């Protein structure tokens, strides 16, 4: 056996005998380091004749490659063994009770939960979320939504007005999220499918009204939108939101400045118990308003009403939260009572999804 064969056998045996990566590294340095045994052999190539390089030189290179491959393979084996040993030492007793984390002790406010639920429903229908400022101009809050001069909503007793600016213009705390509809029409070409959740403000306060409350509106603009589309969208929403197999709805003629025709929508329910049950019973409850977007509103949004049409709807988030989860007093939403939040709040990690259950 030649000296190269002997060195090959010796090094491969040393590599196979290593039990950890430091020992393997020591073998590598002894063989392939600057003063390693294989490196010393490589230094002799310059003094060889051409014939010797073809035989002995090739054998030395083959030795180097064999040792390099063996080291790489052994390193992979040792790494896997180290991982397995660590995993074995880190075994967890899954029968132990889970300690409550700070995130688990906290609660999501019902309004935030309702917004997430509604977003999940309409996102599945292809809607996106639009937002706008809480402080609005008279133009976007009233004029662009077809409110005539002298309309009661423009009066001080119903709307929060700011003091006039240097130009005499008074801004308002928006009384609805509808201004975002006009802003979206100005900024985005049809087709448009949006929902608009947000805070709104009116001078009203009792068990079912608050000076600051939450609304969500929806808007669809295209060339073929019609009342049948409104009915389908709202029926599908109500079935999914109230988590029932079917709902019976009725549309009553109404009036809103920004829609024509306009409807109030009632849903059939059972109000005999402390919690309203939807999808059953013989009672009726109004839940939202809707209608076809008024041609004047389309014009204010920069759209031609002879080419485009649309429908819109709006509802109070606080009210439908009270209906769905049996909350008796709207004012409790804003009292920051930890006991109330513990009872009515939702766990932070239980995000509502259509496949997992909205209120699971």
From Swiss-Prot:
GO MF annotations in UniProt: ATP binding; magnesium ion binding; phenylalanine-tRNA ligase activity; tRNA binding
UniProt-listed SUPFAM superfamilies: Class II aaRS and biotin synthetases, tRNA-binding arm
CDD domains membership: PheRS_alpha_core (cd00496)
Cofactor dependence: Mg(2+)
UniProt xrefs under Pfam families: Phe_tRNA-synt_N, tRNA-synt_2d
EC number from the UniProt entry: 6.1.1.20
Any one GO CC term of the record: cytoplasm
Source domain of life: Bacteria
Cofactor binding summary note: Binds 2 magnesium ions per tetramer.
Catalyzed chemical reaction(s): tRNA(Phe) + L-phenylalanine + ATP = L-phenylalanyl-tRNA(Phe) + AMP + diphosphate + H(+)
Binding of Mg(2+), residues: 260
NCBIfam families documented for this protein: pheS
PANTHER family associated with the record: PHENYLALANINE--TRNA LIGASE, MITOCHONDRIAL (PTHR11538:SF41), PHENYLALANYL-TRNA SYNTHETASE (PTHR11538)
UniProt record similarity statement: Belongs to the class-II aminoacyl-tRNA synthetase family. Phe-tRNA synthetase alpha subunit type 1 subfamily.
Self-association and partners: Tetramer of two alpha and two beta subunits.
UniProt protein name: Phenylalanine--tRNA ligase alpha subunit
Organism: Rhizobium etli (strain CIAT 652)
């Amino acid at each position: 056996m030649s000296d190269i064969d002997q060195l090959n056998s010796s090094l491969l045996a040393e590599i196979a005998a290593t039990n950890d990566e430091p020992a393997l590294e020591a073998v590598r340095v002894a063989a392939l380091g600057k003063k390693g045994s294989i490196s010393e052999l490589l230094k002799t190539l310059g003094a060889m004749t051409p014939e010797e390089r073809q035989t002995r030189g090739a054998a030395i290179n083959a030795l180097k490659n064999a040792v390099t491959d063996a080291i790489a393979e052994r390193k992979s084996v040792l790494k896997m063994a180290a991982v397995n040993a660590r995993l074995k030492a880190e075994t967890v007793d899954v029968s132990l009770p889970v300690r409550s984390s700070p995130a688990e002790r906290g609660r999501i406010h019902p309004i935030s939960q309702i917004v997430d639920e509604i977003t999940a429903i309409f996102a599945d229908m292809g809607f996106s979320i639009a937002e706008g400022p809480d402080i609005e101009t008279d133009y976007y809050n009233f004029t662009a939504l077809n409110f005539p001069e002298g309309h009661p909503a423009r009066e001080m007793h119903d709307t929060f007005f700011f003091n006039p600016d240097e130009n005499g213009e008074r801004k308002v705390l928006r009384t609805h999220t509808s201004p975002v509809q006009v802003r979206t029409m100005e900024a985005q070409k049809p087709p448009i499918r949006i929902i608009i959740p947000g805070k709104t403000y009116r001078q009203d306060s009792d068990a079912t009204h608050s000076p600051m409350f939450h609304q969500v509106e929806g808007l669809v603009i295209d060339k073929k939108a019609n009342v049948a589309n409104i009915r389908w969208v709202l029926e599908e929403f109500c079935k999914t939101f109230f988590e029932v197999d079917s709902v019976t709805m009725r549309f009553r003629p109404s009036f809103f400045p920004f829609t024509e025709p306009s409807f109030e929508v009632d849903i059939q329910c059972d109000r005999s118990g402390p919690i309203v049950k939807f999808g059953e019973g013989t009672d009726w409850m109004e839940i939202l308003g809707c209608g076809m977007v008024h041609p004047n509103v389309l014009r204010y949004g920069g759209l031609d009403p002879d080419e485009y049409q649309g429908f819109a709807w709006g509802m109070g988030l606080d009210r439908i939260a009270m209906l769905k989860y049996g909350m008796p007093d709207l004012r409790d939403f804003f009292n920051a009572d930890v006991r109330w939040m513990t009872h009515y709040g939702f766990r932070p990690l239980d995000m509502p999804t259509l496949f997992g259950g909205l209120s699971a």
